[in-house]
Structures are given as C-alpha cells and as structure tokens.
Amino acid sequence: SSTETPPSYNQLNYNENLLRFFNSKPVTAPVPVELDPPKVESSYVSSAREDARSTLSPVQGFEGSGGSGSSGNFTTGSNLHMSSVTNTSNAGTGTSGTGNSGDGGGGGAGDGPGSGAVPPVTLTESLLNKHNDEMEKFMLKNDRESRGWSGEKNKKSANDTLKMVEYSGPGPGHGHGIKRGGSHSWEGEANKPKQQLTLNAGGMPPLVDIHASSSSLSKCQTSVAGGGGGGGAGSASGTCGTGNNGAGGGGGSNAQSSTNQYTQSGLSCTQNINLWPPFSVGITTPTSVLSTHMAVAQSSFSPQHSLFPTFYYIPASIAASSPASGTSPNPRPHKHTHVHPSSEQPSTSQGAAATMPLQYMTGVMYPHPSLFYTHPAAAAATAMV
C-alpha cells in the first residue's frame, strides 16, 4: 500500500549486489595478512605465480596472476587501497590491461574494463556516498513506478468488478435469484413472525388462541347448526377430536361422520398459531367447545393456501376413544360430564388437552403410523374428565 514506508537502498539493491558479487568470482577463503593469493588453485598455477612474482616486473607479475588479485610487489598501502576494487571488478580483464600502466608504479593496473586508456578513479568515502544516493533515488523511482502500475491495475480491476455487479443487479429479468435465509425479500416478508407449533417443557403443544381464527369458527358454527345442538358437543369433547359412536343422537352422528371423513382423508390441517402473544383459551360455552373441534375438522376440507408451513398427522382414534368408552359406558351421563367441567374451567390445560387434538411440529411429515400416539397427559386428562 502507499502508506507503508519505502524500502531501504539495501533492500532495493539486494539482487544486483548478489549478481555483481558472484560475477566477480570472489575469493571466499580467508586471506593471509601479507595478502598472498589463496592456495586453493593447482600446484602448477601457484608455482608459476611464485616464479613470476620473484622475477618479473610488477606489471608483468600482475599479468601472470590472471587478474585474480593485486600484485605482491605493490606496497602495503596500495594493496589495502585497491583490494576492494580488484576483488569486485571483472576478474578476466587483467591480460588486456597490461603494458599501459608501467609508469604508475602498478597502482590500479589492469583494473579497467579492458581499454586501459582511462585512468582509474580513486574511490573515496564521499564518492561512494554520492553513488549510493544516486542509486537510491533511481531504485526508489523504479519501485514507485512499479507500485503505481500495480495500484492502477488493482483500481481498474475493482472498477470492472463494480460494473459487473451493476450489470447483474436486480432488474426485470433478475427478480428471483438465490435467497439466503434471513435476507430481505422483495415481497416485503422480511420480519413477519414465523408460525409453527413448539412443544413446551411438559411435552404438550401450546394452547391455541381460539379468537385468532374467526373465519374458520364462523364456518364451523354454520355446519353445527344443522347437526343437532348440544348432543354433538358432548361426543366431540369426550373423544378428543374423534367422536363417539352415536353419542347424543343427531349431533353425535354428525360429529362421527365428519371426523371419520377427516380420519380417512388425512388432509392437511393448518392452524394459524402465533408464537408471540400470550396463551389464552377462551372456552366459555359448549358451543365454543364444539366449534373448536369442528374447526379442526372443517379446516381440513377447506385448504388455506396462504399459510405455507403445513403439518400432516393422523389422529389415533382407537387410543383416544378406548379410555373414554371404558370409564363411561352410558352415553347420557357421558354428555353431561363433559359439557359442564369444560364450561366451569375455561382456562385449564386439562380441558384444553381434552378438547384439542395432539399436534406435531409444522413442516414435518411423519411417515410411520407408530409415531402418531396420544400423549399420556392427554389420555390421563380424558380419563379424568
């Protein structure tokens, strides 16, 4: 990024330093104090160098050494001064630089690029610092240009990405794409409360708010009017949503036929249960008890397509009707024992469990019939009533 500190000169010049160092074929062995050439060469070359050093002139001795170091006949001061230059220069140019520097005392002979006509420049600290400053400016300029080019490339790619996003945005042809869970849909259904059945700590489903389904209640009351009145109410509440055989005359037969159709058809029974309001069961009259049961039966024949999460279950008619028929064989007291406690206790969970069928989780289709059992609490409430 542009905010970071610029790299130092050593970092920028690292690769060039490595390349220049290995091109100079440096002497990696420890150099003795008298600056003799290293003894890693062959015996023939070393003996020839010793002979040349003892017999030849300084220039010729430098030629015989192959340009790999300064001559042994130089003074100690010149050797110390020129060691850095000769060790970092091109090592193979010693032979071409001979014969031109015999009068200079051998100082810097053979150090040039091969021409020998240009006099060697004496390296000083100020000259090296000046060279370093110039090279640092040059390297920083190259680094800035390279980073600027990469920054422009990144900016161009970012602009292309933004254009692609704009082109592929929600248009007339892109109305329905992949919708993730929890995202706002275009139909405005982002924050609607979900409606489903949840089991409480006792294993029973929450009590149903009867006043929330007024339309289904009105349908049920019209169907109950032709059914025979209070007799059907006794049979419906006593059998936990399945109906007794002929209990209460005409009303009982009506409830029996409707629940038998509901049991045989197995259609989806959807109930609009809101999770947010507190639980309230407003059972006041036997008519409301009957209409609550009939709402479950009638809603199966009038499917409500507006509610999406539906649940499928088969009521266990045998398990629910056996304890009720065992405790009250006479149908006439059977009617009275069910109508009055339900009206006397309008808000108890036992009465609601006795009048409401057991329901399971929404959106889940239970495939095996053994899963559809009557909860022990519901069976106990039915037996107690």
Swiss-Prot record:
GO molecular function: transcription cis-regulatory region binding; transcription corepressor binding
Comp. bias (Low complexity): 71-93
InterPro entries: Period_circadian_regulator
Subcellular location: Nucleus; Cytoplasm, Perinuclear region
The keyword Cytoplasm is annotated on this UniProt entry: yes
Gene Ontology BP annotations: circadian regulation of gene expression; entrainment of circadian clock by photoperiod; negative regulation of transcription by RNA polymerase II
Protein name, entry field: Period circadian protein
